[in-house]
Structures are given as C-alpha cells and as structure tokens.
Curated annotation (Swiss-Prot):
The Q motif is unique to and characteristic of the DEAD box family of RNA helicases and controls ATP binding and hydrolysis. CDD domains: SF2_C_DEAD, zf-HIT_DDX59. This is Probable ATP-dependent RNA helicase DDX59. Interacts (via HIT-type zinc finger) with the RUVBL1/RUVBL2 complex in the presence of ADP. Residues 234-375 form the Helicase ATP-binding domain. The gene is Ddx59. It is found in: Cytoplasm; Nucleus. Belongs to the DEAD box helicase family. DDX59 subfamily. The keyword Nucleotide-binding applies.
Length: 589
C-alpha cells in the first residue's frame, strides 16, 4: 500500500493496488503555515503504524515483494492504477514515467526520481509501484542478512518478539559492582547525579538488553560504546523517570533520550507515543533522521516531522484525525512550552535536555518534572573541553579585516568555516563580502530564507560544498556539524549560554576544534561572565577585557551580593548576633 504525501483519503481496500493514493499536485495550506521569519516550535511524534487484520475468507491480504514486482512488470508503462475517484491521478506503475525532483522535493530511495508516494511498510519515499516492489525486496534481503547464522543441527534459541513488553533490569555485571566502584566510575567519567533511587550507569549498550535489531542499528549508526551522558541517562530513561540532563555539546544527548523513547514506544498501541519539542527546524530534522536510523526494521515504528515554513498537509499525513498537533502548530511558536505540555497526559514521562541549564530551566523543571533525576556530565554551563577558545578584542570597524585575516591564515583556516552574526542583513552582506574579497565559496543562512533553501544550504555545508557559511543563531543549537573545525563568532552572542551553544558546533564527540570570538565594549555586560566561565578553560583573555572598569564593577557587585547571601544564613557562629540584632530592633520599636 502507498500513502500519499498529502492528507489520507478513505479508499476501498479490495486489493493492494486500489489502495494506492496519488499525491495532490499542490495541497492547499493557506492559513496553516507558520510565520517564516521567526524561530519555530517544532513538534515531532513517534507514532505506530496501524495493523489491519486479514479479512476472513481471503487467501492473503498482501503479496510478497517479488510477486508485486512481477505484477508491475506485466503492466504497460503508461498504465496506472485507477481507483474509484476519477478526478485523481492514477498511481504510476513504472519509474520512467515519473519526473525528476525539483530542489527540496522528496527523492525516491531506489531510482532518485520524484518521491511522490510513501511506502507505508517502510516509511520511505518511492516514485512508482515498480520502485516500491524493488525497495521491499531490498529491505527483505537486508533483514535476512541481519539474522545470525547458526550451524545445522544446533538448537538456536529464538529471539523474543520485538513488541514483547520490555522491562529494564540491571545487567548482572552492573549489579555485581560495589557501591564504591560505581562512585569511582562516576567520578572518573565526570557524571554527577541528584535524585532518589537512581539507576546505576551502564558501561556497554548490551547491558540494556535491547532487541537485536536495535543493537544492529546502533552499530550501523556508529555507536560502539556509550558516552558518559548515555551511560547514566539511558537506564534512568528506561525506568520511566523524569530527567533534567546537561552535558557538553556533541556528547551524544540525542541518542541518550531517543533510545528510551523507542523502547517505551514499542509495545504502545496509542499514537503518538512521544512528543519531542526542539527550538529550531534544523534540529528537528536532524533528530528525526537519527530516530529513523535507530528505528529501522522495528515493527510499526514511524515518525512525524512538523515544522513551520512548509505546508502542513504533507507533514500531517501519518497522524490520526483525533491528534491535535496541528492545532498546537497553528497557535504559533510564541506559546510557551508549558501551554503545549498541558495537553499531554498527567502521567507521561518528561525529559529536559540541554548543553546549558540556566536558572530559568531549573525553575521550569520544578513545575514540569515529578521526582526528577538531575544528571550533569562535564562542567555545567561551560564550553566543551575539546574546543580551543580564542577571545580577540576587535572594534566593530575592524571586524571584517580581522575575519579576512583568519580566512587567509593557513594554520587557522580549515573549511568549512561557520561564522555567526547577530542579524539577517548582516549575514547576507558579510557572506557577499567574503566571496568578493577572499574568493571563497560562501553563503548565508537565516530564518527569512525558505525551509527548502535552508535545507539545501545545510546539506551543502555537511557535504563540503561551501567553504564559509555565515549564519544567525539558527545553526547554533544541537546540530551535528561534524566536518566543521572552525567557528568564528563575528558578533559576540547576547548571553554566555548562547556562546556555549555556538562554540559547541565544533568539538563534536570529542573531536578537536577552534572557536574564535570577537569582543568589544558592545558586550560589556558579559565581561564578568566571560572571565568566570571562559578563563578557567585555559583561554587567554585580552587585556582590554581584563582591565575594563565594567568587569571590575560587575565583579564587585557579585561579591557584595554573595556576602549578603552568606550573612543571611543562620549558622552556629552567627546565631547569637542575629538574636541580638532582632532584640535591638524590637526594643527601638
């Protein structure tokens, strides 16, 4: 069966071919698009494919992929499958009758033509019945190659069904470790945990008892051993606990929350089973791609990606009519996360994950999380230790010249270079200047560009098509830009948390990288924060910053505030002084 790239329509289910649905040429989405010039609240739901029982009396409700391929090949190239709705286009039988895709359109996984349809068995884009049958044959062969071969006559223990109810139990190896050994392990890995009855960290993915298909997907995706945040966060998530987690940029946080989501969604009948909110479209697209890699071959597992800037019907085709995700999208991203989560069940598991945990997130966690486990790996709210940070004092008129010097420096210049600026117009102008002056291939990316343009630019960045990409903050959070070795903060970010995220585009998963930041008196309110959080990493700060009166004034105010806080605390040493002050003030009244 095919699923069109538009909203589902009711069909007669007499046979597999009649149930194929063609995509409407231009789905009407007026009034459903979000404003493209702002950051977007993104909703992603892990859903299940509906299972339809065979009708009694029928020999078989589905045919094998090879039979489907033979059936397609016996049909003329110009013959499509017509249904009871004469106003709609017939489903294309052969790939050669399908057109080539335009930029940003889905691509057939078999032949590369326009992916007009979606195979509901694999959730992949296909262009015709012919490519659907070929694709299913490929999937069947891949699944056969994953099955472990056993010697003839040897009794092989059957693997438990993937949709069997999963209960996480600590591996015997983990149980056998003493408490002091666990604490030593946490200290060596930099894992800090707060909470009641917290699960012990795992040391290997095999300690989780995942289905073999998921273990194979982990290896194919490059996950050999868990990172520190994954060691602690995965077992806690598998037990259904609420989590507030902070870890270095590029430390594997996405897989740390995706694996428990996938496992807990396997036996669920209700759809959707999980909702993931991200601050940018690009991060949502990346998370969905990683989820699909990990879910490949697992039964009835699907994803839905809902982002602003694209027509909603093609994104909503997998959701049942009773799901209210489209309503939440139309409300606009400016609604707070609290408003969205009010629509979720009261007993659902909630996980908050970030590279930085400011006070606002701590306050939000107190409202959202029930008996949470707080997990921190690395230095909280500090840049990743594998990133070499360089802070340069550069006045605004000299910024372009300094950037061109860096791009011409053979020791520093390692393309592709990611340059962050604070406004959209500045991104466009700086990108043009870089290409004109240095001759390097350059482009800009920001929220005013269409989603199709942004996707193509991001793809080009990852594939090395651009030597320099000038961006606003939309590329500053969560994205795995593994080939980026140099980041330049042309404009100092508005907060140290944003600085940590932007610097974190290099140094992914322990790789070395360099981040160069231009700073001047326009960022004077951040001087003390920079000194506190960047200097401990070994970075040399410019003397203009260290000798600035703004820095010394901010330092004095913070020290005074700390002294006031200390004096308000009641201890054995100051208890009598507090009593005397209270008696004196009472007698004066």
């Amino acid at each position: 069966m095919f699923v069109p790239r538009s909203l589902k329509l009711k069909r007669n289910s007499n046979d597999d071919l009649k149930s194929c649905e063609a995509k409407k040429s231009k789905p009407e989405a007026a009034g459903l698009q979000l404003e493209g010039n702002r950051e977007t609240l993104v909703l992603e739901s892990v859903t299940k494919e509906a299972v339809t029982a065979d009708r009694p009396g029928s020999a078989s409700s589905t045919s094998s992929p090879s039979c489907q391929l033979a059936e397609v090949c016996s049909t003329g190239p110009d013959q499509g499958v017509k249904d009871s709705h004469p106003s709609e286009e017939p489903v294309k039988s052969f790939s050669k009758t399908q057109r080539w895709p335009e930029p940003g359109e889905p691509v057939c996984v078999v032949c590369g033509r326009y992916g007009e349809y979606i195979c509901d068995k694999t959730d992949e884009d296909v262009c015709s019945l012919e490519c659907k049958a070929k694709h299913l044959l490929q999937v069947k062969e891949e699944e056969g190659s994953l099955k472990p071969s056993s010697p003839q006559g040897a009794a092989s223990e059957p693997e438990s069904p993937l949709d069997a109810f999963y209960v996480y139990k600590e591996h015997p190896f983990i149980v056998a470790l003493r408490d002091d050994q666990i604490e030593t392990l946490k200290q060596q890995l930099g894992i800090s945990v707060q909470g009641q009855e917290v699960a012990r960290p795992i040391i290997d993915f095999e300690h989780c008892g995942f289905p073999e298909t998921l273990n194979q997907n982990l290896k194919k995706s490059g996950y050999e051993v868990p990172t520190p945040i994954q060691m602690q966060m995965i077992p806690v998530g598998l037990l259904g606990r609420d989590i507030l987690a902070s870890a270095d940029t590029g430390s594997g946080k996405t897989a740390a929350f995706l694996l428990p989501v996938i496992i807990r969604a396997l036996p669920e009948d209700k759809t959707p089973s999980a909702l993931i909110l991200t601050p940018t479209r690009e991060l949502a697209i990346q998370i969905e791609r990683q989820a699909k890699e990990l879910m490949r071959g697992l039964p009835r597992m699907k994803t839905v990606l809902l982002v602003g800037g694209l027509p909603l019907p093609p994104q909503l085709y997998r959701l049942q009519q009773h799901v209210k995700a489209d309503t939440m999208l139309k409300m606009g991203f400016q609604q707070q996360v609290l408003d969205v989560l009010e629509h979720t069940p009261s007993d659902c598991q909630t996980v908050l994950v970030s590279a930085t945990i400011p006070d606002s997130i701590d306050q939000l966690a107190d409202q959202l999380l029930h008996n949470p486990v707080r997990i921190v790996t690395g230095d909280k709210n500090l840049p990743c230790s594998s990133v070499r940070q360089i802070i340069l004092w550069v006045e605004d008129p000299a910024k372009k010249k300094k950037l061109f010097e860096i791009l011409n420096d053979q020791k520093l210049f390692k393309p592709p270079v990611l340059v962050f600026v604070d406004c959209k117009l500045g991104a466009d102008l700086l990108s043009e200047a870089v290409q004109k002056i240095t001759g390097l291939s350059s482009t800009s990316i920001h929220s005013e560009k269409s989603q199709v343009e942004r996707r193509e630019i991001l793809k080009g960045l990852l594939e090395g098509d651009y030597e320099v990409v000038v961006s606003t903050g939309i590329l500053g959070r969560g994205l795995d830009l593994v080939n980026v070795k140099l980041v330049v903060n042309f404009d100092m970010p508005s907060s140290l948390d944003e600085y940590v995220h932007q610097v974190g585009r290099v140094g992914r998963l322990g790789q070395n990288g360099t981040a160069i930041t231009f700073i001047n008196n326009n960022s004077k309110r951040l001087f003390w924060d920079v000194a506190k959080r960047v200097k401990p990493t070994g970075s040399i700060l410019p003397p203009q910053l260290l000798n600035s009166p703004y820095l010394h004034e901010q330092k004095r105010k913070e020290q005074q505030k700390d002294r006031q806080t200390q004096s308000s605390l009641v201890t054995g040493a100051n208890l009598m002084d507090i009593i005397r002050k209270h008696e004196k003030s009472s007698s004066q009244k």
